[in-house]
Swiss-Prot record:
Region named Disordered: 486-607
Taxon lineage: Eukaryota, Metazoa, Ecdysozoa, Arthropoda, Hexapoda
The organism's place on the tree of life at top rank: Eukaryota
Protein name per UniProt: Pescadillo homolog
Domain BRCT: 320-413
Length: 607
């Protein structure tokens, strides 16, 4: 008898399960199922044909791949979650009976979830874990600012606080920071760790405001925090050992004191004070700077290669960036956010301090004469020292992004600051702000100004070459004119002898005249004509080329090609909108300036 093929028993109909079916198969509640999927990295799938995958149902449901659910069935944590469900029921029963002794015993025996094997499973190599540090550090820095709540306990916040401080200390010791940026969301930092770029966000410190459950589900965030704390512990241990630092690090101040847990100001002060202290090394081996110097010496061998030359220039620029603030001492006023500035200054070799009467961890006083810069964010100061520069905080961020110490005249107290440009913009961006373009041009001009003598000598050589070229052109024109006049004169003088010559010499003279005429034609100067392109025809040709290019794309790549075209159109549209908006702003500013000038003139004439 032939086996009958039933509907939805093969193909997409048999490959997907709904969330309800998956929970029934795993015998877990909704909360435990979400927690398990977060820990294992399992996410819902989007099928190609939803109607077939949902077995004819028209409702939009959350679907999971059948292989993913089978993969979760073999996870040992599933048994722990089932045991927890039983323990929760028993603890609730003991609490209802009023038997506190039995309740405490069951709470002490509450099963714990171990995530070590999941970390090894999801990140087989250390580089894989580094690639996932972006979300990890962003979430840990966010949780470190939370107070103790019902869902987010004090243990989680203190652990996030400790791990984030350890990671910042590694960036300081290895000088791994590369880019910084300030926005309304917080402080953006980018570090280079083991050849991988890690970007994370540190939020601004504002008083905590409770959020509604519809907006933020702290239970889901807690599941991510549990996973990322274990992951960050492994990563920090490996990073500290790679640069010969003792782990766990010993800080001069306690990060888990009772006062810091109850008082937010004390917590922030102790956290920043920990950043301003050096860590203990496991041995006195050479630092990474010596290794970089050895690599630079090896690159000196092949100076003809353009790639090697570029690598050497990048290495030299990176070494300068690592020691950007070396030898400089900064005093931070109390109105300035200290943690991001202390972190940046310490990463690039600078020394920072603040008022020791207000915050702990200060290393020198404001009256120290060796202070080179004082960071101020107020319109004026009653007392100022001549031996130091008073700058606004943006100067620190712009210096790091430009990889050089910028002039302080644009960042003085009360000055209108230049635009704070993002260093994360790509070079192939369609729209480039005018300020960024001017800044790029200014960098080139400054580079030329630093090499003043070379630029002057190059200009002199160019002027000499131009003079020689002009003289050569003048000599050629003069020779052409002389040759032309000689040809005309010789033609007028040869008319008389031609009548007296015999008929035998006539062919030779004809050949000579033909050659002269050909020379004249070759030496003739013809005025050029400007070719005007028709924009409509040019647009038509480009459309035809695009259509031809689209026909040449293979059928399996046409969907990807359409997505690429849609993305390009979207980027072009956004760039055009930004350009129009910029033109409107510039026009408005020009009108305001003209109106201001008119009012000033009227006031002067009225006087």
């Amino acid at each position: 008898m032939v086996k009958r093929n039933h509907k939805f028993q093969s193909g997409e109909g048999a490959q997907y399960l709904t969330r309800k079916a998956a929970m029934r198969k795993l015998q877990l509640s909704m909360q435990d199922f979400r927690r398990l999927c977060i820990l294992k990295g399992i996410y819902p799938r989007e099928p190609k044909h939803r109607a077939i995958a949902q077995r004819g149902s028209t409702d939009i449901k959350i679907l999971y791949h059948k292989k993913d659910i089978t993969f979760l069935l073999h996870e040992p944590i599933v048994w722990t979650l089932r045991d927890r469900k039983i323990f929760n029921r028993r603890i609730a029963a003991a609490k209802g009976k009023g038997n506190n002794l039995l309740k405490n015993v069951r709470m002490a025996n509450y099963p714990e979830i171990k995530l070590d094997h999941i970390i090894k499973e999801r990140f087989p190599t250390f580089v894989d874990a580094i690639k996932e540090l972006d979300d990890c550090m962003t979430l840990l820095f966010l949780f470190s600012t939370f107070p103790a709540m019902k869902t987010v306990t004090r243990d989680i916040t203190s652990m996030a606080r400790r791990l984030s401080i350890e990671f910042m200390h590694y960036c300081i010791a290895s000088k791994a920071l590369r880019k910084v940026f300030v926005s309304i969301k917080g402080y953006y930092f980018q570090a280079e760790i083991k050849g991988e770029l890690v970007t994370w966000i540190v939020p601004h410190y504002y008083p905590y405001q409770p959020q509604r459950k519809e907006y933020v589900d702290f239970k889901i965030m807690k599941s991510f925090a549990d996973f990322f704390t274990v992951m960050a512990g492994f990563v920090n241990f490996r990073l500290y050992n790679s640069i010969n630092l003792v782990y766990p690090p010993q800080f001069s101040v306690s990060l888990d004191s009772e006062e810091s847990r109850s008082n937010e100001d004390t917590f922030i002060s102790e956290r920043i004070a920990a950043l301003n202290s050096d860590l203990l090394r496991s041995d006195q081996m050479g630092t990474e700077e010596e290794d970089d110097q050895i690599d630079l010496d090896l690159l000196d061998g092949d100076k003809d290669s353009e790639q090697v030359r570029k690598l050497r220039e990048d290495a030299v620029s990176l070494n300068k960036l690592k020691n950007l603030f070396k030898g400089l001492k900064f005093f931070i006023n109390r109105e300035v956010p200290r943690e991001p500035l202390v972190f940046i200054l310490r990463c690039f070799g600078g020394r920072a301090s603040w008022d020791r009467n207000l915050f702990v961890g200060a290393t020198f006083d404001e009256s120290d004469e060796t202070i080179t810069h004082q960071i101020v964010d107020r319109p004026s100061l009653p007392k100022q020292y001549i031996s130091r520069d008073y700058v606004q905080p943006q100067w620190i961020f712009d210096c790091v992004n430009q990889r050089k110490l910028l002039p302080v005249n644009k960042y003085l107290i009360g000055a209108v600051l230049p635009p704070h440009l993002s260093p994360f913009n790509r070079d192939d961006a369609i729209y480039v702000p005018p300020e960024e373009a001017a800044l790029r041009d200014g960098v080139e001009l400054d580079a030329g100004a630093r090499n003043g003598e070379e630029r002057i000598s190059d200009d002199e050589d160019e002027d000499a070459e131009q003079r020689q070229q002009v003289q050569l052109d003048y000599a050629l024109v003069k020779a052409f004119r002389e040759e032309k006049t000689e040809a005309l004169n010789s033609g007028a003088l040869e008319e008389a002898p031609e009548e007296e010559d015999d008929d035998e010499e006539a062919p030779e003279e004809d050949e000579q005249t033909k050659q002269k005429n050909e020379k004249k034609k070759k030496m003739a100067v013809v005025s050029g004509k400007i070719f005007k392109e028709n924009p409509s025809e040019q647009k038509k040709l480009t459309k035809q080329e695009e259509a031809l290019r689209a026909r040449m794309v293979k059928s399996r790549h046409k969907k990807l090609y359409r997505k690429m075209l849609e993305k390009q159109k979207k980027q072009t549209k956004e760039a055009n909108l930004l350009k129009e908006k910029r033109q409107q702003i510039d026009k408005k500013q020009r009108v305001e300036q003209t109106q201001k000038r008119k009012t000033q003139r009227k006031e002067i004439l009225a006087k």
